[in-house]
Amino acid sequence: MASHPAVAMVGVIGQPDARVGELPCAYVELIKNSKTTVNELIKHAEDNIGEKAAVPKHLELVNEMPKTPVGKIFKPELRKRAITRVYNEALEKAELSSRVQEVIDHPKKGLTAMIAKNGVNDPKQIGKILDKFIFKWE
């Protein structure tokens, strides 16, 4: 991904997947004024990454990559974004109104999705959907 001329920075993380645990996911910051599209970047990845399983299953453009104070990509923030997106998609697909309110770094459980239940969905219903994933939820 980083070899594409329009890519300024790329962060690749494992996003949750109910079937295999995690799948590759890329967040890309483009160089200023680039008009490159997600589809172009996916095609570039497919053409240049030798291992098919390593090609990102989700690619998202970001205005600015989250960084540490020394300028390195802050991957925990990217993981939180991926967990939020994947869990919300799963809840929506199951026709549940609950959504991820935030993802916290729990001292014992690690990254944990905090679910806003809105008083509508039974936690057992939510569990049937989210317990399939590797990251915890509350």
Residue ranges and their predicted role:
Residues 1-10:
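Short acidic amphipathic segments
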Residues 9-17, 25-32, 38-138:
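Conserved C-terminal "lid"/linker of ANL adenylate-forming enzymes
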Residues 22:
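Glycine/proline-rich active-site loop of Rossmann-fold NAD(P)-dependent oxidoreductases
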